[in-house]
Each structure stands twice: as C-alpha cells, then as structure tokens.
Amino acid sequence: MSELNYEELGLKVGLEIHQQLNTSHKLFCNCSTNLKEDYKLTLERYLRPALSELGEVDVAALFEWKKGKKYVYRIPITTSCLVEADEEPPHAINEEALKIALAIAIALNSNIVDEIYVMRKIVIDGSNTTGFQRTAIVALGGMLKDEGVTIQTIAVEEDAARKIDEGTDQVTYSLDRLGIPLIEISTGPDIRSPEQAERVALKIGQLLRMTGKVKRGIGTIRQDLNISIKGGTKIEIKGVQKLELIPDIVRYEAMRQFNLLKIKEELNKRGVSKNLILSNFVVKDLTELFKNTNSKIIKSGIEKGGLVYGIRAYKLKGILGWELIPKKRRFGTEIADYVRALAELGGLFHSDELPNYGITEEEINKVREALNATTEDGFILIVGERERLDKAVEVIRDRILLAFDGIPKETRGALDDGTTKFLRPQPSSARMYPETDIPPRRIDEKLLEDAKKFVPESPESKMKRYITLGLSEELAKEIIRDPRLDLFEELVNKYSPKVSPVVIASTITNTLKYVKSKGGDISKINEEDIEELIKSVYENKISKDSISEILLEYTTNKNVELKDVIRKYEALPTEELEKIIDDVISSNLDEIRKRKDKAVNLIMSKVMSKVKGRAEGKVILELIKSRLKNVME
C-alpha cells in the first residue's frame, strides 16, 4: 500500500481510551467487578429511544430501535443485583473510581470540575438494560506534553453488558460486566500520523496502568478513533482492542476517505447527479432469469424461497468496483455493509466483479437487457426474502446517493485486518440528559488529597530511578517506551534485587527482539510467560542466561508449553557442570597449551555450546579459570 502524504491530506485523528478500573465494586452498586458465568435466571427487554433534554431523538438510537430486536440478559448471582436489572435506583457513585480518575486528571494537568454531575447517554443497542449509559465528566482540558496532544475530557462511566450471542431477532447479554467502572480519556484531533496515533494510545495506556488501579487483559481496554481528512467529515471507529492495529486502521481509513472523495469527483466529471440516479433507478425481480443458474449463493437463496432483485446503477460502471483500500475494500463493499447492517441481508453482487461466483457472461447480458442498462451503467444483484429485499433496495439507493456527498457521517467497527465496516449512523448531540437518581458530588480537598496517592510517576522521574537501579540510559529509555512498562515495575517489585532489574528490562525489550529476529513468533509470549521465566530465575530453577534460548525454543515450536521448555533448561548441578568443563579441557589440552592465557575464550565457547544457558556465564568463567590455572601449572 503506497503511503499517503498525511500533511497534504489534512489528516486529523483523535482518540478515546476506555479503560476498566480495578475497584472493589461497581460504579453504582456494591457488586463485584469480576466476570462470572454463574447465572440461573434471565430477563427480557425491548428498548425504545427517549427524548434528550433538547426534546430530540438521537439518530443512532432510532437506528437501533428500528431493528426491533429482543434483548435477553443473563443474571449472574454474584456479580449483579437489582441495579443492573434496572429494578432499583443506582447507589451513590463509587468514590474509589472517582479518586483514580482524578489522579489521571492531575497527571495530565487537566482542569478538575467543581461538581460531578452524572448524565444519561442514550444507548438502545441492548448493551444496557436501562436504554442509557451513565457517564460523568471529571475534568476538562490537559495535555500529553511530549506529543503536543490536547486532552478534551476525562470521564467516568459504567461499562456495557457483555454480549454473549446475536441472532436475527434476539441478542443475549450477561450482566456481569454491566456497571464496571470505566475511565474515558478523549484527546483533541491533534494527531497527525498513524504512528503518532499508536504512540499516544500507548502513552495514555501506560499512564493508566502505572496507577496500579486498572484491570489488565483482553477486553479491559478499548481504543476508539475519530479520523478525518480535508474535505471530509469526522468518522468514529469503535472497538480497537489491539494497540498494534491502530497505525493500519488510521492508514486504511485515511485511504478509504481519500478514495470516497475521488469517487465524488468522478461522479461530477461524468455529469451524474442525485436526480439522475433517482430518475434512472430501475429495480426488477430477476428470479426467473436465474432459475437454472450455477451460482451457489443465488441457487441456495432461491431454493429457500427467496427472490433475486436486479438494480440498475446509472452511469456507475467502474464506480462499484472502485478500490477504496487496495485488495481489501471497494465501493461495492461499502454498499454491502449498509445492506448487511440495515436490511440484514448478505448475498450482494455488482457488475464490476462479474462474471464470477458462478454467474456467467450470458446471465450478465440478460440482466443488462432486463434492466435497460447501457455499457456505461453498472448493476447490483441481491438475493433474499421479499420484505428484506424491499428494505435493501432503499438502502442501496440511499448509499449510492450518499456518494455525491463524499464521506458519509458514520460510526464504523474495527476489523482484525485493520479495515473497518459500517455499524450505524453517528450519534447526534441529542443523546444526553441528566441522571435524576444520583445527586451531584462536590470535589472537596479530602477527595483530591486521596486521589494524589494514585498519581503516576512522571517519565523524567522514572528515568532517574531506573538509572539508579542499574539500567543504562538507553535501556531505561527503551523500557519507558515499552507497552509492558507496568509489567517491568511489577516484576522489579516482586523479584529484585535477587533478579537484577537489568535482566528484567532486557528480557522484556532486547530478548524479545532477539527472539523475533531468529524467527520466533513473539505474539505467543504473554505477560504471564515473562513472569514465569523471571520467577524461575528467582527460584534458581534456571539461569538468566537461558532465558533467550527458552523463549526461542518456545516460540518456534507450535505444540510446546513454556513449562516443558523451562524444565528442559533447568540449571545444571555444580558437579555436572564441573564434569562438562573438565571433559572440554581434557579434549583440548594441546590447543590450551598453544594458546596459553587466550585459551579461556576457546574453552568458554565450547562449554557454553554444551551447557546451552543452563548455567550462569559468570559461574562458568570462574570454574574454567580455576581449572585452566591447574592445567597451565
């Protein structure tokens, strides 16, 4: 993928970091914040939008309501109560969560509000039994100084219910996650490159982890991105779980938006308008035409009682297949996403990708004839039941018309390959209204003093402290930049001074680079694996010099467990090590006498190759020197 000039493009990126807080109980009740599957009962709800305090209905809420889905909630015994079921008013806001949020606000030089007011944010996708999420702004403004990125808001809010399953008409959630305290940090649109977006997310994540009061693991932190380019509009991208995906998401989204603007230009060049699209919009039932087709998808749809609709796309030849992201997404993919989300139909084909999928040239010609399509026109085929097809036709028409505006205002979901898909229209400002069951909480001096206990150490202070621990300036800088900085702190607290902080830092940084350079799959290594190795050194089970070899063997063999590799590299008993050294010396006596004092390096090399990290290099060297001294005498 060729790199765009982001400065010329006018790229602007803002981040919203959502991190679960590790508090003793939930935000508005006393239930545990652990996830549990111990449910015996369920409850069912249908949700509908409410008016905001401005008397308006949010478009995103309206979109979800139109799906008409039933929501089923599993009720865990130990991690939910009547508050989660919306059968009891919320309790007072969790003071511990407030203190953690205030600590982060202090660290980011934000302006802390005088009073905290809880608001209701309308959300009716079923992720909350109430139809809204409770949220409260704690601070405004602030700065991530070394990146020049402003902080807009810091808020505490309740996490959503955990989605278990989703079908056509029903979604199942668990209430165990609902109400876990989250901190939300929103930056200004000051980020100017994909790499900077990753750095900013990393630094905010590190700041949060260094409080020692946030949860860790998959699903505990989520990054949302707001991305725009010159001539476009802000696009929200939800649910980025992996930090390393952020640069690709920014690159791909910038490219997608750039090409959507190019399509807008091309439509203008062709002299096409919205009115011409509408006046030449032809829809035909082509089921009979495809009754003997070899296309498996169409054939299967017809056999299930479905129909095949053909839609003329006036003067859109080449537009439907226009690559928005090379080899990943076309304009036709965007239309298919809308149809999937709004009409709940798959099985969409367009003329720029045919003949393919079992659809022949002869069938294509018949479709063109039936739709009165010229060589300048495109067409779309879609399969399904009549009711959904009628809805799909409206969706396709509306998405084609949106192409004349360039970039539609959307909320999109992050995918594992760094691309995104349409989720829903962007929510408007008409989604907030005050929470009437919770009184305001004034920020007093005692609360601020308590919060200061959680304020994380500054990078400059860390650098000085790490150097006093024995790290070189270069290694100290490297560990401060590393995503596993908080793991380093944790392991140093647990296992030093017996295991040197230098060994711990080197394992997390340099050793992992070495393993990767040798072909190891370092994505296989998690934080628990690193701790297991450091703990094994601490307990004298293995030598620190064996860490790199253990990790290399572990990451280059798919079907091995770390504990088995560690067992293989357990430290040699002194007697066995001495025997290996004696054997090497006796096998190289002539060379030793010839090299004299320089023989140490030769013997050291040969012993190390036999020991393979199962003994400390320092210990081996001392034993070799003492034995060579006897030989030389």
Curated annotation (Swiss-Prot):
GO terms under biological process: glutaminyl-tRNAGln biosynthesis via transamidation; translation
Annotated keywords: ATP-binding, Ligase, Nucleotide-binding, Protein biosynthesis
EC annotation from Swiss-Prot or TrEMBL: 6.3.5.-
CC annotations in GO: cytoplasm
Xref: InterPro entries: Asn/Gln-tRNA_amidoTrfase_suB/E (IPR017959), Asn/Gln-tRNA_Trfase_suB/E_cat (IPR006075), Asn/Gln_amidotransferase (IPR018027), Asn/Gln_tRNA_amidoTrase-B-like (IPR003789), GAD-like_sf (IPR004115), GAD_dom (IPR029351), GatB_C_1 (IPR042114), GatB_Yqey_C_2 (IPR023168)
Summary of subunit composition and partner proteins: Heterodimer of GatD and GatE.
Function in brief: Allows the formation of correctly charged Gln-tRNA(Gln) through the transamidation of misacylated Glu-tRNA(Gln) in organisms which lack glutaminyl-tRNA synthetase. The reaction takes place in the presence of glutamine and ATP through an activated gamma-phospho-Glu-tRNA(Gln). The GatDE system is specific for glutamate and does not act on aspartate.
Name of the featured protein: Glutamyl-tRNA(Gln) amidotransferase subunit E
Organism whose genome encodes this protein: Saccharolobus islandicus (strain M.16.27) (Sulfolobus islandicus)
